[in-house]
Amino acid sequence: MHFLSAESLEKSVAAKNVDLVVAPAAFLAFSAPNSLHELASIVSDAAPDSSRSLGAAVIVRRDREDLKTLKDLRGKRVAAVVDEPSPGILEVKREVARLNADPDVFFGSIQTVPRLRMKEVLSHVLSGRADAGILRGCFLEDLWKAGNRTFEAEIRVLDAKRGDGLACRHSTALYPGWPWPLRKGSPRMPPAP
């Protein structure tokens, strides 16, 4: 098993160097729609329907009254983890495309936070180094459940969605969660012993 960045995973799938992938469905939908098919998917208490369990939260400081919707982030500095298959950046880019804007040039800059360090996105936003941050859906709730509530009153989620199947704060449409896609054309998996 290997941990690959989104770009490396795309190249590996295209080169047919992998048979089984564990990645958010956004990767499957946006980066490899014709190369992989879903074998199984993960569900959670926050999203019992695996087909609608992954989204992203766009956060801003509560005192940034100039930032009310995703549209207001045009030309702004955004912090995000971008070298994972999808911690939220792909879902947000999809929302930007729905605004009839080019997601590759919409933001003024994207401040890259190292993978597995999503909490640093909060630091960028709270310190003012970024105007907004992109988090995976349920990241805030996971921090709060772990007892880290120091920033709760200082941030808000833009375009917060409710009642769509995910019991966490999020700004984007929902996608299937973490499927286990198999490369099309892979040899059949042997039966379990």
Predicted features by range, described:
Residues 1-30:
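Extracytoplasmic small-molecule ligand-binding "clamshell" domains
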Residues 61-64, 74, 151-193:
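Extended ligand-binding regions for polar small-molecule ligands
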Residues 37-51, 106-111, 145-174:
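Short beta-strand->loop
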Residues 22-35, 92-98, 126, 131-162:
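A ligand-binding cleft/hinge motif common to bilobed small-molecule-binding domains
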Residues 48-123, 138:
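Bilobed "Venus flytrap"/periplasmic-binding protein-like clamshell domains
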Residues 18-22, 28-55:
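Short beta-strand-centered segments that line the small-molecule binding cleft or hinge
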Residues 13-14, 73, 125-126:
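Hydrophobic residues within well-ordered alpha-helices
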